[in-house]
Amino acid sequence: MQLFAFGVNHHTAPLDIREHVAFTEESMQHALHDLVGHQLVKEAAIISTCNRTEIYCNTDTPDKAVGWLADFHHLHSGDLEPYLYKLLREQAVKHAFRVASGLDSMVLGEAQILGQMKNAVKSAEQAGTLGLLLHKMFQHTFFVAKEVRTSTEIGACSVSMAAAAARLAERIFGNISEQKVLFIGAGEMIELCAAHFVAKRPVHVTVANRTVERAEALSRRFNAHPISLGELPDQLALHDIVVTSTASPLPILGKGMLERAIKLRKHRPIFIVDLAVPRDVEPEVAELDDVFLYYVDDLADIVREGLDSRQGAVTQAETIIDSNVMDFMHWVATRRSVPTIRALRDQAEQFRQHELSRAHKLLAKGEDPVKVLESLSSGLTNKFLHSPSSALNQVSNDEREQLVELVNRLYQLRYPR
C-alpha cells in the first residue's frame, strides 16, 4: 500500500470540468463507502470545494482509483485525464501540506481551506474510511499548516473570495450602501460574504435558502430578511446584488428567471457573483445585456492583489513544508519495518520461554542453580546466534562480504580488521 493523491483544481481544470466531479455533502459518505467498498483502496478521504476536488488514499492500484472517479460521476476517463494530477508517496504528502497551508489556493494563504480539509477528514472518520496512514498524514498536515501560519506572513494582506466579491460589487456600483443585496444559501461561504457586504451597510439584505430555518438563523445575525428558494422568482427583481453559493447539483437561477427580473427592473443592471461548484447560475445568463455575472474563477485577478509582497513568506513556507515531508516519510519508512521487529521480538520471546521452562525443570530436579543459570544463558546465546551464523556459513562468496557488513552493523561489532 502507498499514499496516492489525485484530482483537479483551479490550476489544472476550468470551472465546467470541476463542477462535473464535485461531491455534495449528501453524496460524500456514499462516495467514500463506494470507493473503499470496491476494494480499490484501503483508506480514503475526499476534499471537494469550489476550487478543487481531490482524493487522498492508501492503495496498491492508483489507476483503478482514478478510474473510479470518472465512473462515479458517469464520465469518460479520457475526458477527465487531461485535467488530472496524480501524486505518489512524498509528492502526495507535500501536496497535502501545501494545500492546508494555503499555498495552492487561488487566495494565497487563505485559512478557509484548512477548515475544509478538517471537515473532509471528519467525513472520512464518520464513514470509517480513515486508517492509520491517512490519519497520521492529516494530523501532520494540520501541524504543518499551523506552523506555516504562525512562522510566516503567508496570510498577511490576503484577499478572501468573500472580500473579493464585495470589492467587485463596489467597482460595479461604486457604493454598496445604496444597493439591495440577496444572498442565496446559508453555508460558510455565504456567511463570510454576508460579513463583508453588511459591513458596507447596504439598504436591504435578504437571505434565501432551501431550509428556511437556516436562512432565519443567518438573518438574525445580519439583520436580514429570510425567504425560501421558492420565493426567488418574485424576490429576484427587487435586488441589485446577488451572491449565491449553495450545494445544489443543478442551477438555481436560469436565463428565463433573470430575463423576467430584468424586465421588472426596467433594465436596471443586476450584479451576480456565483461562488458555487457546481454553478448555481446557468452560463446562458451571461448573454443578457443587463446582467453582470461573475463565477468563482473570474475573481482570480482580485484575490491575487498583494501577492508580490508575500513571495518571501512563500519561500519560508516551502522550506518548512519540505522539512516536514522528510520527517513524515521517515515515519512511513519505519512503519514498514514494524512487522519484522514484531516477528523478531516474538521469536526472542519463544526462545526465552523455552529456555526458562527447561531451567525450571532442572531446578525442580535439584540441579545446581549456578549450572542451571550457565545452561540458560548458553542456550539463549546459541539460539539467538544460530540463524545469523548459519546464514554467514551458507551464503555465496559474492554475497558474503555484504552480509558480513550487515551483521557487523546490526550487532555493532568492533574487532581488528
From Swiss-Prot:
Keywords: NADP, Oxidoreductase, Porphyrin biosynthesis. Pfam families: GlutR_dimer, GlutR_N, Shikimate_DH. Possesses an unusual extended V-shaped dimeric structure with each monomer consisting of three distinct domains arranged along a curved 'spinal' alpha-helix. The N-terminal catalytic domain specifically recognizes the glutamate moiety of the substrate. The second domain is the NADPH-binding domain, and the third C-terminal domain is responsible for dimerization. Pathway: Porphyrin-containing compound metabolism; protoporphyrin-IX biosynthesis; 5-aminolevulinate from L-glutamyl-tRNA(Glu): step 1/2. Homodimer. During catalysis, the active site Cys acts as a nucleophile attacking the alpha-carbonyl group of tRNA-bound glutamate with the formation of a thioester intermediate between enzyme and glutamate, and the concomitant release of tRNA(Glu). The thioester intermediate is finally reduced by direct hydride transfer from NADPH, to form the product GSA. It is an enzyme of class 1 (oxidoreductase). The record marks 95 as: Important for activity. Catalyzes the NADPH-dependent reduction of glutamyl-tRNA(Glu) to glutamate 1-semialdehyde (GSA). Belongs to the glutamyl-tRNA reductase family. Substrate binds at residues 49-52, 105, 110-112, 116. It catalyses: (S)-4-amino-5-oxopentanoate + tRNA(Glu) + NADP(+) = L-glutamyl-tRNA(Glu) + NADPH + H(+). GO terms for molecular function: glutamyl-tRNA reductase activity; NADP binding. NADP(+) binds at residues 185-190. One of its GO terms (biological process) is protoporphyrinogen IX biosynthetic process from glutamate. The active site is at 50 (nucleophile). This is Glutamyl-tRNA reductase. Its EC number is 1.2.1.70.
